[in-house]
Amino acid sequence: KNEALEFSLQAGEKIGFVFPIYSWAPPEIVLNFIRQLSLKGYKRQYLFFVCSCGDDTGLTQQVLEKALSHKGWKCHAGFSVTMPNNYVLLPGFDVDNKELEEKKLADAVSTVSKINASISKREELFLCHEGSMPFIKTRIINPLFNRFQMSPKHFYATDACIGCKRCEESCPVENVTVVDGRPVWGMDCTSCPVSYTHLTLPTILRV
């Protein structure tokens, strides 16, 4: 939403941003949220971020720290949690096999526990798995992704659609509306796979 947001902070309060990685960077919706956010009573309180990724984060830490510094805020810590891949909207991308999926989920439990401990202690550290070629992924591929993939124009519903409205209810930006039993996409799309992954049958596809 394009509107100002204000939060009042207490002296010892922690500030946290939790988000998924989109093409090796924070989603534009998260960066826009930071631009619109006002923290009343900010006095360098402990600020951290936790991001989830399928494999690696690229230069997410750099991108987020720059966005926060533009607001006059210092980022004290950042962490990544590797989760099962769920991006299936481009050729060559698919979900992980069952064995890898279960391993990632099991490892994530331990990772989150360690992150919680670090945040509780207000530790100042960054544990983000950048992966290989982070500059290319974040500085070259990500802008192309934001320019050409952040669109709903290729989505369509198959004949298996029963008008259950799960896509409408799960859309994080309220961009999907079910009309006459069929989903209709607006233009405020973040190109996330939530509508696809929330369905029990593959009724929403992308060409």
Q: Where in this protein do the model-derived segments appear?
A:
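FMN-binding flavodoxin-like domain, especially the glycine-rich phosphate-binding loop
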Residues: 1, 6-19, 23-144
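Conserved small/polar residues in nucleotide/adenosyl-binding loops
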Residues: 197-203
